[in-house]
Amino acid sequence: MTATLERRESANLWARFCDWITSTENRLYIGWFGVLMFPLLLTATSVFIIAFIAAPPVDIDGIREPVAGSLLYGNNIISGAIVPSSAAIGLHFYPIWEAASVDEWLYNGGPYELIVLHFLLGVACYMGREWELSFRLGMRPWIAVAYSAPVAAATAVFLIYPIGQGSFSDGMPLGISGTFNFMIVFQAEHNILMHPFHMLGVAGVFGGSLFSAMHGSLVTSSLIRETTENESVNSGYKFGQEFETYNIVAAHGYFGRLIFQYASFNNSRSLHFFLAAWPVVCIWFTALGISTMAFNLNGFNFNQSVVDSQGRVINTWADIINRANLGMEVMHERNAHNFPLDLA
């Protein structure tokens, strides 16, 4: 009898726990994806902060020339970074217990792998949590689909690119100047500026910013008048009030006259679908571009493609970019090679 009561009580406790995890009444929705997400992102964030402040130099190129990235070793917010794992580690899974000591783990850049892998799993779980909450509220799944674009981009630079290049040392450093260094080296080795998928990504980011600004300014300008003609239209409103204040027909008419009729949406759902789809699809393409360049399927090469009737090269901007690429190529990892293979 006692055993039966204990089993029933424990089953009841588990059911209450499940209800609490999946409840949409909580101030912060947890969900089953959240059970994974919260510890993963807390771990990644904690290790990032500690390593950014105090991690010792890392032998990133595997040639016994450590590179310092933390604040306590002379960096500032701009120059500081979590330095990627050593080329000596390559793609090996390198948790703390695989190293002979914590000092060795730090010297070989173990924190980078720890942060990146926990972060990628964490943001994937965040995407799953978005879907889970949408599902429980009876919503459609497009919020999680939209979030898949930055998840794909992060996965491309932190995981797919190192896999393609054969080492986590080729991943993007976790810092401001480290990000710029990654971009410059990526251009030198893969000519990303001449890749159509990167061009789509630029169109997505800048176009998305433009469309967002245009939409926001149109909505806040197309007020439904609540005052007489002799008063300012602004007098009829309070900033941040809850009920709808704009007229999409007026906004459509304004924008149609500003550019041309069919450049303007008169359907709110079509408009918002476009605002979501444009940057998301373009960033998907960029992530796909990074993932193909990871395996050295690079941007277009138009070097010396224009010649005169005598066969002499007429330089184009492609040749200017090529010369810049060569300069960046010989500058990075300056002591790792006697002569860069790319130039041989």
Curated annotation (Swiss-Prot):
N-acetylthreonine occurs at 2
Query: Under which name does UniProt file this protein?
Result: Photosystem II protein D1
Record-annotated site: Stabilizes free radical intermediate: 190
Residues holding chlorophyll a ChlzD1: 118
Q: What biological function has been recorded for the protein in this entry?
A: Photosystem II (PSII) is a light-driven water:plastoquinone oxidoreductase that uses light energy to abstract electrons from H(2)O, generating O(2) and a proton gradient subsequently used for ATP formation. It consists of a core antenna complex that captures photons, and an electron transfer chain that converts photonic excitation into a charge separation. The D1/D2 (PsbA/PsbD) reaction center heterodimer binds P680, the primary electron donor of PSII as well as several subsequent electron acceptors.
How would you summarize the oligomeric state and partners of this protein?
A: PSII is composed of 1 copy each of membrane proteins PsbA, PsbB, PsbC, PsbD, PsbE, PsbF, PsbH, PsbI, PsbJ, PsbK, PsbL, PsbM, PsbT, PsbX, PsbY, PsbZ, Psb30/Ycf12, at least 3 peripheral proteins of the oxygen-evolving complex and a large number of cofactors. It forms dimeric complexes.
Residues bearing Phosphothreonine are 2
| Membrane-crossing segments per the record | 29-46, 118-133, 142-156, 197-218, 274-288
Q: Name one Pfam family in it.
A: Photo_RC
Q: At which positions is a quinone bound?
A: 215, 264-265
Q: Where does chlorophyll a PD1 bind?
A: 198
The gene from which this protein is expressed is psbA
Keyword Signal attributed: no
Q: What organism does this protein naturally occur in?
A: Staurastrum punctulatum
Which residues make up the binding site for pheophytin a? 126
